Amino acid sequence: MAKYKLEYIWLDGYTPVPNLRAKTQIKEFDSMPTLDQLPMWGFDGSSTMQAEGRSSDCMLKPVACYPDTTRLNGVLVMCEVMMPDGTTPHPTNSRATILDDPDAWFGFEQEYFLYQDGKPLGFPSDGYPAPQGTY
């Protein structure tokens, strides 16, 4: 059996923009762990704006895992935040209810740059545009 570094990653409760949080645990597996082998894990939600100090337990539910190529036997574990019962999504967990909204739409945007003579189209031929230019 090999020891694996499981890096649990989740979004905290800060607004308007949540931050990424992480904590690591070491567990032994015969091979790279699969999602169903990863346990739920508790954390103190009072330090992440996801609970009050008097009742601060929250749970991390693994929803995806990927090899961490920067560490030997590392695994990145993407998590949802759940209430202490482990089944109810935390109010800051907007991902858990996304499929309940029939009007949810997602789009992808691909950006392109057009070049002429090795510079972006419209750039001056002898340098760069002014710092606050129209580009």
Task: Describe these PLM feature segments.
Residues 1-135:
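Glycine-rich, acidic/polar active-site loops that bind/position phosphate-bearing ligands
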